[in-house]
Amino acid sequence: MGQKSNPNGLRLGIIRTWESKWYDVDKKVPFLVGEDFKIRTLIKNNYPKSTISQIEIKRLKKSNDEFIEIDLYTSKIGIIQGPENKNKNSLINKIEKLINKKVQINIFEVKAINKIAVLVAQNIAIQLQQRAFYKAVLKSAIQKALKSGIKGIKIIITGRLGGAEKARRDSISMGVVPLNTLRADIDYAFEEAHTTYGVLGVKVIINHGEVLPNKTIADTRQIFSSQYENKKNNNKRHFVDKKNFKKSTS
């Protein structure tokens, strides 16, 4: 029986890069991977859902001391930083106590929240936990994503949908979502919604289009988004005020 691979992992080294960027002796690798997992878990538990979209960890060495640089991509900078950077400094202290190493955190703002699979999946999970009807939630998420200029989206939800006694699977898709095309910029995320009648699984797959030759994912997305905005502006209807309109006479 065939098994589906993770679209993000399938594209590593082809059009995607790793979220942990470091190298070391083979003996230390398992320990450092476990350390990265602890850091990511601490950061995710420290902030509410639908806040952080990506965590990148870089390990550097300065004067024989290991130095960790963490890049946080978020749609809510105010929550991450807090008043006078209190939340950020508190997070740095927690991580330094956990791993006993110096840490620096860089925060980057993400604006197009409806185009990022992680944030879309987390938003759906939050609404399901608030007892919203799942079909309305999925349709709303798809409409918002399509308006932001993506090529296609697919959302899969499993569990006791609507409180039914028997668990089942439902999915909605719009546009083109080519999972096996390696040059396609596919963004994938999975999230769990803990409801009163059980755990629901939410999978979101978003297609941003094919990555152009000799271009990075970020460059390609910027090109496609600018093309979409230009097309959107050109398709706007021009209304004429009939009262003040006068025909030109030759």
From Swiss-Prot:
Listed InterPro entries: KH_dom-like_a/b, KH_dom_type_2, KH_sf_prok-type, Ribosomal_S3_C_sf, Ribosomal_uS3_bac-typ, Ribosomal_uS3_C, Ribosomal_uS3_CS
GO cellular component terms listed in the entry, alphabetical order: cytosolic small ribosomal subunit
SUPFAM superfamilies: Prokaryotic type KH domain (KH-domain type II), Ribosomal protein S3 C-terminal domain
One term of GO molecular function: rRNA binding
Pfam families: Ribosomal_S3_C
Gene3D superfamilies noted in UniProt: 3.30.300.20, Ribosomal protein S3, C-terminal domain
Keyword Transcription: no
Name the record gives this protein: Small ribosomal subunit protein uS3
Domain KH type-2: 39-111
Family listed: Belongs to the universal ribosomal protein uS3 family.
Superkingdom of the organism of origin: Bacteria
Organism from which the protein derives: Alder yellows phytoplasma
